[in-house]
Every structure is written in C-alpha cells, then in structure tokens.
Regions:
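A short, Lys/Arg-rich alpha-helix, primarily the initiator
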Residues: 1-23, 62
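Short, charged recognition helix plus adjacent turn
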Residues: 1-3, 37, 55, 65-74
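Short polybasic/polar patches that bind polyanions
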Residues: 14, 26, 55
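Short alpha-helical DNA-recognition segment
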Residues: 17-37
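Residue-level signal for the short linker/turn that defines the boundary of a DNA-recognition helix
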Residues: 18-20, 45-48
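DNA major-groove recognition helix of helix-turn-helix/homeodomain DNA-binding modules
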Residues: 48-63
Length: 74
C-alpha cells in the first residue's frame, strides 16, 4: 500500500514558498479542502491529485509517496 508522505510534501512545498494548504492548493489546482485533508492525514490523494502535486513542484512522484505495510495502512 502507498501513502502520501506528508512530511516530504510539506518540506518540498515550503522550499517553493508554499507554507500553507491554501498555497499548495493555488499552485496545484487541487481543492483547498482536499489539500487540508491530505496534510492532516485524513485522506489520500488519488493518482490524478498525486500527479498534480508532483508536477507542480517538479518532482518525481516517488518523492511524495511512500510504501507502508498493509497492516499499518488499516
């Protein structure tokens, strides 16, 4: 199973001057409410949103997605 690496996303976004969910939303076009749910760990992005994050910050998708054991994901 794969999950959004929230720590890495925050780090990369901050390095691009995006220190808030609002700023991430503006850069990526992902709805602000979705970004805040991702940052709180309440939701996971679908492939489309994950690709938007990667493209907006010019990074490999694997930088913001991490593999987690299936038991930990439940």
């Amino acid at each position: 199973m794969f999950r959004l690496n929230i720590t890495m996303l925050r780090y990369i976004a901050k390095n691009h001057g995006d220190g808030s969910g609002y700023a991430i939303s503006r850069r990526t076009g992902i709805p602000e409410s979705s970004v805040y749910r991702y940052l709180k760990g309440e939701a996971q992005p679908d492939l489309n949103s994950a690709m938007r994050l990667a493209e907006a910050y010019d990074i490999d998708l694997r930088k913001v997605i991490k593999r987690v054991p299936v038991e930990a994901a439940a």
